[in-house]
Design a protein with these regions (language model features):
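Conserved phosphate-binding elements of NTP-dependent enzyme cores
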Residues: 1-952
C-alpha cells in the first residue's frame, strides 16, 4: 500500500489528550483552534519534532554533535513522516551582520556575479582598471626611498582553514627559507603546526631586498617568480611600512592602486579581505548619543539636564566638582540652561577638555583643597567604562545611552573602497542591495541586454537564480524590502516569509514543511500571493502544514484540523478534521461557528466622536515617510493600516511611541525623524504592548510579571502558621535562599546532560518538583501550599482568591483577556507571542486607569483565533470607554472594522509608500477607491449591514 498518509497515535505533548489523527501527505493542511488549544503542540512539538529528530538520529554521532540534541515528543507512534523543516516566527537573527540578502542567500549569488562579471574601477579617479604588467609593478616599487628594506611575498593561501601542510611542503621542496603566516615570520626549517579550524594566510618570502640602484633585474625576476607561484598575485612587504599588493589582472596606472584577484570572498562584509577596516563590515558603530545625555536642553545642570549614569547632579558629588570647574573655565553656572551655554562649553561637557586642565575645589572631612585636572567628557567617560567593564548590568545601563552611527569610512556600505569600485551597470554591490526588491528586478531587466556576450555566458545562470529569488520575495508581498536591511529589524511575519522563499528557491520535494502563521503582518491584498506560494510548495511534492487563523487561508486549504474545543486543559482534542464544509458542520467547532456565520464579530452601531483633542505628528520623515502630518483623535479606538512596508511601524513605533515614552515616561529612546508631536498636554502616559517575551528565564511567569505573586506571598506570610514560624513574604519566593529547595535552587526540575542524546529533565528528588523546602510547604492557606497555588490555572485561582480583592482583580484581568487556561507558575519561555502580549495587556488593565493614557499595540491579533480576536476587541473597547486612547497597527479586517478611526498609509510599500491614502471612520475609508484597505473593508461592512437589516 502506498504510504500516502501521516498517521499519529497517542500524542500527549503538553495539553494534547492522547490524540489520534490521520493526515493526507503532499497536501496543504491548516491547523487551527483557540490560542492555547494545542495546535502548536501538535504541529511543531509533535509532528515536526519527531520528523526532525528521526532525520538527525540517522546521522553519525560526530555530525549530531554540531546539530544539537532533539527531545523525543510524547507520542506513541507516527508513521509516514518525511524529513521536516520548520519555518516559525521566532528565529529572526539579531546578529548585526545578518541581512535580508544573506538570509535569502541572494547576496551569495551577487558576490559570485560581481566577482565574475563586475568591472573594476580605481576608487580614486573612477577609471576602469586594466591589467598590470611586471614592468609597472617594478616601477611602483622603485619609487621607494633609498635604503628602504622590503621583501617580495607570494600569497599562496588567503584566509583559508586547514593546516596548509601541502603548501608549506611545496615551499620547502622549492628551496624557500622563510614564510609569513598570519603576519608572523617562520623559518621553513622549523616544524610549523597550524590550527586546523582557523583561517590562515600563508605568504612565501621569495626575496629580501634593500632599495638601491641596479636592483631592477633582480626585483623583476623575484616578482615574476611570486606571480608564477600564485597565479598572478604578488606583494611587496615594506619593513616598517605598508604592504603593496600587485596583480597581473587589475591596477590603476595613475594611482598605482591594485585590486587583488576578484573573488566572491572579496565582496563579503564578513570576510577581512573585503570588509571595511574601520567598522569591520558592520557599517555602523555603537556610540553614546548626546541627545540621550542631554534630552531637554531647556534645563540647567542643577535642574537635572544631564541624564547619564554616574553624572546625575547631586550636591557635594564628584560630578558637581567637575561641573563647577567647567563652569569657571567656560563661563556658565549650574543654573544656566544648556541651550544658553556656548558651543565650546557644551563640547567640553560632552567630549572633554583635551589636554587643558580645569580648576576644581574639593571639600571633605579632612579639609578642602584645589585640584587641577583634565576632564575626559561625559561621552568619552561612558564609552571608556562600556569598553572596560565586565559587569553585564553596567554594559546594559550604559548601552541604553548608545545608538548606531554610520561608519565615516564606508558610510554604512560595509565594504572597502576598492570593492565598492567594482560595478555592473554603473552600480556597485552595495548600491544594488540598497534598492528595493521591485527596483532591483527592474534594474536587472534594464541592464541584462547591455551585457557583452562573454558576460552573458558567464553570468547568465547566476542572474537567473538571483531573479528567481527576487521574484519569490515579490510573490509574498516583500518587494518593498532591500537586501541590505538588517534581519534583526524584520517582523516575525516578514522573517518567516523570507525563509519561505529560500525553501521554494531550493525546490526540494518530499519534505514536510511546518509553518507558524505565515500571514502575520501581511495585508489582505498580498494574502492571495502567499496562498499561491504555499500551494506551489505543495505542488513540488511536499506536505505543507500551516498553523493559521486567517479565513482565506483556511478556505484555500486541502484539509483543516480544528484543535480544541477550548484552550489549555479545555483543549487538546481534535474537534473536527476535513474540508471547510466538514468544519462548518461540526457542532463542537468554534472555528466552524465563525466560518459558517453562526457567530461573527459585529460592527459597532456607532463610532465614538472622541474628546475633541488630538495628538499630531508633524513632518514625519522616518524611513520612507514623506514629510507627512498625522492627527490621532484622542478618546477613540484608532487603527493604523496599510500595505506591508507602507510606514506604519515607522510612524507609530519609531516616532509616536518613542516621543511619548521620552516626554511622558522619561525613557531614553530616540524618536524617529519628525518636526515634533503636538498635544502632549492632553495625555499623561503611554503604554506600548508588544509580543516580546515577558521573561527570558524559566523563573519568570505570569504571576511574577503581573505582580500578583507578591500579593499571594503576602497572604501566605499572614497565615497563623507563618506568623508562628516568623516567615515573611520572602520565605515564599523561589528565587532566593530561605524558603526554596536548594537542591534545585527553586526550579523544581534538574537538567541532566546526556551526550549525543537529548538532555533529560527530571523532577527534583528532594522537593518532587514543588520548588520549596518541606518547612515552607507546611504553611497552607485554605488547605493549599504556595506550590499548589503556582500550579493552579488562572480560572481556578480567581475562585480560590475570591475573598482577596487585590489578588482577584489582577487575576480577573488575565481571565478577561482569555488566559484562564494558563497556570500561574507557567514558565514565560513557553508562552507564545500572543499569550505574552495578553499577559502584558492584563497587567496594564489591572492598573488604575487615569482616562488619559495612550495604549499602543503592534498587530495584537497575531496568533489569535477569531474567538480570541472577538474577546480582545471587547477588552480594547473597555479601555477606550474609560476615556483612554487605543492606537493599533493591524491587518485583521475584523478588528479594523470595529475601530472608530482609521489612518491608512500607502499606497504601496517601501519607497512607494509613506503617504496617507485615507483616514476617517471605516465607512469613510471604504469609499476611498485608492485605498487597498478600503477595498477589502467595503464588502465586509456591506455584509454586516445586510445581516443587521435581516435581524441576524
Amino acid at each position: 500500500m502506498a504510504n500516502d498518509k501521516i498517521v499519529i497515535k497517542g500524542a500527549r505533548e503538553h495539553n494534547l489528550k492522547n490524540v489520534n489523527l490521520t493526515l493526507p501527505r503532499e497536501k496543504f493542511i491548516v491547523m487551527t483552534g483557540l490560542s492555547g488549544s494545542g495546535k502548536s503542540s501538535l504541529a511543531f512539538d509533535t509532528i515536526y519534532a519527531d520528523g526532525q529528530r528521526r532525520y538527525v538520529e540517522s546521522l553519525s554521532s560526530y555530525a549530531r554533535m554540531f546539530l544539537g540534541r532533539m527531545d523525543k515528543p510524547d507520542v506513541d507512534e507516527i508513521t509516514g513522516l518525511s524529513p521536516a523543516i520548520s519555518i516559525d516566527q521566532k528565529t529572526t537573527s539579531h546578529n548585526p551582520r545578518s541581512t535580508v540578502g544573506t538570509v535569502t542567500e541572494i547576496y551569495d549569488y551577487l558576490r559570485l556575479l560581481y566577482a565574475r562579471v563586475g568591472v573594476p574601477h580605481c576608487p580614486v579617479c573612477g577609471r576602469v582598471i586594466s591589467q598590470q604588467s611586471v614592468d609597472e609593478m617594478v616601477d611602483a616599487v622603485l619609487k621607494l626611498e633609498e635604503g628602504t628594506k622590503f621583501q617580495v611575498l607570494a600569497p599562496v593561501v588567503r584566509q583559508r582553514k586547514g593546516t596548509q601542510q601541502k603548501e608549506l611542503d611545496a615551499a620547502r621542496r622549492a628551496g624557500y627559507a622563510r614564510v609569513k603566516i598570519d603576519g608572523n615570520m617562520y623559518d621553513l626549517d622549523e616544524e610549523i603546526a597550524l590550527e586546523k579550524n582557523i583561517k590562515h594566510t600563508v605568504e612565501i618570502v621569495v626575496d629580501r631586498l634593500a632599495m638601491r640602484r641596479g636592483i631592477r633585474g633582480r626585483l623583476a625576476d623575484s616578482l615574476e617568480t611570486a606571480l608564477a607561484l600564485t597565479g598572478g598575485v604578488a606583494e611587496v612587504d615594506v619593513i616598517g611600512g605598508e604592504c603593496m599588493p600587485f596583480s597581473q589582472n587589475f591596477a590603476c596606472p595613475e594611482h598605482g592602486i591594485s585590486i587583488s584577484d576578484l573573488s566572491p570572498r572579496l565582496f563579503s562584509f564578513n570576510n577581512p579581505l573585503g570588509a571595511c577596516e574601520k567598522c569591520t563590515g558592520l557599517g555602523t558603530f555603537m556610540r553614546v548619543d548626546e541627545e540621550r545625555i542631554l534630552p531637554n536642553r531647556d534645563l540647567s545642570i542643577r535642574e537635572g539636564a544631564v541624564k547619564a549614569s554616574g553624572w546625575y547632579y547631586a550636591e557635594g558629588s564628584v560630578a558637581e566638582m567637575y561641573y563647577l570647574g567647567l563652569g569657571k573655565k567656560y563661563g556658565f553656572t549650574l543654573d544656566t540652561p544648556i541651550k544658553e551655554m556656548s558651543t565650546e562649553a557644551v563640547n567640553a561637557l560632552l567630549y572633554g577638555t583635551n589636554e587643558e586642565k580645569i580648576e576644581m575645589h574639593r571639600t571633605n572631612e579632612f579639609g578642602s583643597g584645589v585640584y587641577y585636572n583634565t576632564f575626559e567628557g561625559i561621552v568619552e567617560n561612558l564609552e571608556r567604562r562600556f569598553r572596560e567593564t565586565n559587569s553585564e548590568w553596567m554594559k546594559e545601563e550604559i548601552g541604553s545611552f548608545m545608538s548606531g552611527v554610520e561608519c565615516p569610512d564606508c558610510h554604512g556600505k560595509r565594504l572597502k573602497p576598492v570593492v565598492l569600485a567594482v560595478t555592473i551597470g554603473g552600480k556597485n554591490i552595495s548600491d544594488f542591495c540598497e534598492m528595493s526588491i521591485r527596483d532591483e528586478l527592474k534594474f536587472i531587466a534594464d541592464n541584462e541586454p547591455n551585457l557583452t556576450e562573454k558576460q552573458k555566458q558567464i553570468g547568465g545562470q547566476i542572474m537567473k537564480e538571483i531573479k528567481n529569488r527576487l521574484q519569490f520575495l515579490q510573490s509574498v508581498g516583500l518587494d518593498y524590502l532591500t537586501l541590505a536591511r538588517s534581519a534583526g529589524t524584520l517582523s516575525g511575519g516578514e522573517s518567516q516569509r523570507i525563509r519561505l522563499t529560500t525553501q521554494i528557491g531550493s525546490a526540494l520535494s518530499g519534505v514536510l514543511y511546518v509553518l507558524d502563521e505565515p500571514s502575520s503582518g501581511l495585508h489582505q491584498r498580498d494574502n492571495d500571493k502567499l496562498i499561491a506560494t504555499l500551494k506551489n510548495l505543495r505542488d513540488l511534492g511536499n506536505t505543507v502544514i500551516v498553523v493559521e487563523h486567517d479565513e482565506d487561508t483556511m478556505r484555500s486549504a486541502d484539509y483543516i484540523v480544528d484543535v480544541g474545543p477550548g484552550a489549555g486543559v479545555h483543549g487538546g482534542e481534535i474537534v473536527a478534521a476535513g474540508s471547510v464544509k466538514d468544519i462548518c458542520k461540526a457542532k463542537r467547532s468554534i472555528t466552524g461557528d465563525y466560518l459558517s456565520g453562526r457567530k461573527r464579530i459585529e460592527v459597532p452601531q456607532t463610532r465614538r466622536p472622541g474628546n475633541g483633542n488630538f495628538l499630531t505628528v508633524k513632518g514625519a520623515r522616518e524611513n520612507n515617510l514623506r514629510n507627512i502630518d498625522v492627527k490621532f483623535p484622542l478618546g477613540e479606538f484608532v487603527c493604523v493600516t496599510g500595505i506591508s512596508g507602507s510606514g506604519k511601524s515607522s510612524l507609530i513605533n519609531e516616532i509616536l511611541y518613542k516621543t511619548l515614552a521620552c516626554e511622558l515616561n522619561g525613557a531614553r529612546s530616540r524618536a524617529g525623524k519628525c518636526d515634533g508631536v503636538e498635544g502632549l498636554e492632553f495625555v499623561d502616559k503611554v503604554i506600548g504592548i508588544d509580543q516580546q517575551p515577558i521573561g527570558r528565564t524559566p523563573r519568570s511567569n505570569p504571576a511574577t510579571y503581573t505582580g500578583v505573586f507578591n500579593d499571594i506571598r503576602t497572604v501566605f506570610s499572614q497565615t497563623q502558621d507563618a506568623k508562628m514560624r516568623g516567615y515573611g513574604p520572602g520565605r515564599f519566593s523561589f528565587n532566593v535562599r530561605g524558603g526554596r529547595c536548594e537542591a534545585c535552587e527553586g526550579n523544581g526540575i534538574l537538567q541532566i546532560e546526556m551526550h549525543f542524546l537529548p538532555d533529560v529533565y527530571v523532577p527534583c528528588e528532594v522537593c518532587k518538583g514543588a520548588r520549596y523546602n518541606r518547612e515552607t510547604l507546611e504553611v497552607k492557606y485554605k488547605e493549599k501550599t504556595i506550590s499548589d497555588v503556582l500550579n493552579m490555572t488562572v480560572e481556578e485561582a480567581v475562585v480560590f482568591f475570591a475573598n482577596q480583592p487585590k489578588i482577584a482583580r489582577k487575576l480577573q484581568t488575565l481571565l478577561d483577556v482569555g488566559l484562564g487556561y494558563v497556570t500561574l507558575g507557567q514558565s514565560a519561555t513557553t508562552l507564545s507571542g500572543g499569550e505574552a502580549q495578553r499577559v502584558k495587556l492584563a497587567n496594564e488593565l489591572a492598573r488604575r486607569s487615569t482616562g488619559k493614557t495612550v495604549y499602543i499595540l503592534d498587530e495584537p491579533t497575531t496568533g489569535l483565533h477569531m474567538a480570541d480576536v472577538h474577546r480582545l476587541i471587547e477588552v480594547l473597547q473597555k479601555l477606550v470607554d474609560a476615556g483612554n486612547t487605543v492606537i493599533v497597527i493591524e491587518h485583521n479586517l475584523d478588528l479594523i472594522k470595529c475601530a472608530d478611526h482609521i489612518i491608512d498609509l500607502g499606497p504601496e510599500g517601501g519607497s512607494a509608500g509613506g503617504l496617507i491614502v485615507a483616514e476617517g471612520t471605516p465607512e469613510q475609508v471604504a469609499e476611498v477607491s485608492g485605498s487597498f484597505t478600503g477595498q477589502y473593508l467595503k464588502p465586509l461592512l456591506e455584509k454586516d449591514a445586510k445581516l443587521r437589516a435581516e435581524g441576524k
